[in-house]
Amino acid sequence: MLTRLRNGILRAQDLRESGAAIPAQRPSMACELVDLSAKRATWRVPVPNQADCYLKAEPGGAERFVVHIDAETFYRRWLETSPTFPKQNSQDCVPRRAMSLDSKFATAAAAFRSGRDAPVTLPSVGYWAAASGYEVAMSDGMTRTFWLLAHRVRSFPVSVADASWATILNGLAGIGVAPIAFSELFSRRA
């Protein structure tokens, strides 16, 4: 009960702080695509005050899309559309200061430390329609996303299952770079 109350208070503080911080920040840029082959695309994600981390996409299966998101805008959107008192083991966002309490946070940290030779899979982001518009739904990679947000990266790419949601997410939290289909991305390889 106290943890839920603490998270509710931290959530309110984060929403106030992120609302005030957005206009003052310089625009985020897309993460650098550092490797592109038939088997993998790898992006370098700068992490403040520590080594960069790397995210990857692999071709195959159903068509997916890469959307480069502004981390602060995405965090605010996800947090404000999550309940004030999130349920445990849900897709709800928690305040940054509570993200490291996720049971898999240490595993995500270890995976990101593996560097460019063993990049981490892009988080998979979905949505559902709500009375207030669209709400964020994490289908895979929630703890990875927590790690990136807790470490205050400026932007990072995510994977999205369909073109319409890629366009919507890009409008809600994108950095101004059009979403790209995996098929188009992997057709660019040399």
Walk through the language-model features, giving the residues of each.
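Short alpha-helix boundary/capping and kink motifs at helix termini
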Residues: L2-A30, V34-D35, K39, P46-A62, ...
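Basic- and aromatic-enriched surface patches that contact anionic nucleotides/nucleic acids
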Residues: L2-G8, L15-G19, L33, G133-A190
